[in-house]
Amino acid sequence: MYQWNLPYRKDDVETGVSSRRPLLYPAMHENPELRWGFIRKVYSIIAFQLLATVAVAATVVTVRPIALFFATTGLGLALYIVIIITPLIVLCPLYYYHQKHPVNYLLLGIFTLALAFVVGLTCAFTNGKVILESVILTSVVVLSLTLYTFWAARKGYDFNFLGPFLFGALTVLIFFALIQILFPLGRVSVMIYGCLVSIIFCGYIVYDTDNLIKRHTYDEYIWAAVSLYLDIINLFLYLLTVLRALQR
């Protein structure tokens, strides 16, 4: 495995890197080619996860008996609860084994398929127009924030300070979501809650992309991909929540 602090000099002939090659950020002390290779690998994994999510979700939406089984039977409800908690359970061993091949890929597959099933069941009872709007909006936001973060990193900006604030805000909203199970929110409150959580995950996209550019070691490609994949999926689901509330 490559090491994080691999030295890099603009005039290093052994690395084969031209002195004219731009750095990803001003204080970069590693070979840009290695970091770009790592970034491409992470985004390739994310692309595979998203394609798998689309395939599974599309199957659940189009094959109506699947969604009806989960919605109308006791066994289906029990399985749905298991599927919901599976990604949370798998995250623990995935974090521990994210550098252990091939266990990391196996756990990543289980995690992705379980979350894809959750997305599919959520979309199965949602208007197609709302789903399309959510997909388009999520794509635009993710692309815009990713490009902005790469541009900001090149200019010398750092977003590591966002970590504690995002974690604190997300913790508060998670407890708020647990409370609303006992005391359901109205339509306006659901919209406000969905917007707030969407903003938080926009912040997480910037934060995790900044970590991808500067901080993740080269053997942390699985965890880097999982972090950004979770940001994208959660952003989509909460934008979907907001748009569904608007249609009521």
UniProtKB/Swiss-Prot annotation:
<feature type="transmembrane region" description="Helical">
    <location>
        <begin position="188"/>
        <end position="208"/>
    </location>
</feature>
<dbReference type="GO" id="GO:0034620">
    <property type="term" value="P:cellular response to unfolded protein"/>
</dbReference>
<feature type="transmembrane region" description="Helical">
    <location>
        <begin position="105"/>
        <end position="125"/>
    </location>
</feature>
<feature type="transmembrane region" description="Helical">
    <location>
        <begin position="42"/>
        <end position="62"/>
    </location>
</feature>
<keyword id="KW-0812">Transmembrane</keyword>
<protein>
    <recommendedName>
        <fullName>Protein LIFEGUARD 3</fullName>
    </recommendedName>
</protein>
<feature type="transmembrane region" description="Helical">
    <location>
        <begin position="222"/>
        <end position="242"/>
    </location>
</feature>
<keyword id="KW-0472">Membrane</keyword>
<dbReference type="GO" id="GO:0016020">
    <property type="term" value="C:membrane"/>
</dbReference>
<comment type="similarity">
    <text>Belongs to the BI1 family.</text>
</comment>
<feature type="transmembrane region" description="Helical">
    <location>
        <begin position="74"/>
        <end position="94"/>
    </location>
</feature>
<keyword id="KW-1133">Transmembrane helix</keyword>
<dbReference type="Pfam" id="PF01027">
    <property type="entry name" value="Bax1-I"/>
</dbReference>
<dbReference type="InterPro" id="IPR006214">
    <property type="entry name" value="Bax_inhibitor_1-related"/>
</dbReference>
<feature type="transmembrane region" description="Helical">
    <location>
        <begin position="130"/>
        <end position="150"/>
    </location>
</feature>
<feature type="transmembrane region" description="Helical">
    <location>
        <begin position="165"/>
        <end position="185"/>
    </location>
</feature>
